[in-house]
Amino acid sequence: MVHEVLQSHLAAIKNGSAPVNYEINSWQDLEQWFQAHLELQKRYKMTRGCPFGTVGNELTENDGLIRQDLGHLFEVVKHKLAMFFVREKAQGRLVKDANEEHLAAFCIATIQGAMLMGKIERDGQTVEIAFREALMHLKRYAVTPKS
């Protein structure tokens, strides 16, 4: 059953019907991506973390298929995020030494950690702070293109 649920979430992420927009085409889209995760958590009064992180936390050594599903799901999300950074770099709006894959992984790790802390504290403030700090960090890689 978990496999089918994860496959459904993966399909929604791929086709754009997920509750969170994973099509990031601007810094504003990235900010909205972070904010959408917080809004989802607030909808449940901060009693839940990321459903994917929750499933991942429950994995055992015998859950190979679920581990594979989650790995694929996170790779798809990471790829979508990385492609935003790739486009920014190609257009001269990201420093040349920025590693797009690392920035995308940082975004995912921030979401997972912040939502876990929000659930533990039952408060969105920590989540908001983490997201704001993450965006400030990421924007340090942004540059104005040379004319």
What do the predicted segments below correspond to?
Residues 1-18, 31, 38, 78:
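An amphipathic alpha-helix adjacent to DNA-recognition modules
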Residues 4, 65-76, 83:
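Short, solvent-exposed amphipathic helices
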Residues 5, 43-44:
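N-terminal helix-turn-helix DNA-binding core of bacterial DNA-binding proteins
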Residues 29, 44-65:
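Amphipathic alpha-helical segments used for helix-helix packing
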Residues 32-40, 75-91, 105, 110, ...:
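C-terminal peripheral helix-coil segments that are non-catalytic and often amphipathic
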Residues 46, 69, 83-95:
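A surface-exposed regulatory interaction patch that couples sensing to output
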Residues 96, 100-104:
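Membrane-interface starts of transmembrane alpha-helices
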